[in-house]
């Protein structure tokens, strides 16, 4: 009986310790952003005929999302979501494949494959791969709401033919 009481008292203090640890974890700030609607709004606007006219197959290059925030963002997942949204809206748009991007980044001496390219390097890279349009995307801000910006750049001239920002909550 005494052994049972000692065990019960120890169990209570142990469960209190678990509860304190759980409440500390619970207070951690996790930020869940909804990129889907922001991307949808930007892509719908970008693909309007007054911004871009696509009548036959066009090759696009979209580099990894640039993260200018103080939070972790799965840049590859967001980049793939942007590609997917564009592909749904227009099946004449094709993207430079990931393995081709990786191979050509190594070829021109870019050692950090997972790093976003600056615009001039991305345009140089696009020209070497016969790409017509380059899409630059970036998320910025220190606090909510964060801003998602997508730019559509005509590779031939380097002109930004479309740019839009949307808030992500």
UniProtKB/Swiss-Prot annotation:
Gene Ontology molecular function: any one: enzyme regulator activity
Species of the source: Buchnera aphidicola subsp. Acyrthosiphon pisum (strain APS)
GO BP annotations, alphabetical order: peptidoglycan biosynthetic process
Gene Ontology annotations for the cellular component aspect, listed alphabetically: periplasmic side of cell outer membrane
Record Pfam families: LpoB
Name this protein carries in UniProt: Uncharacterized protein BU358
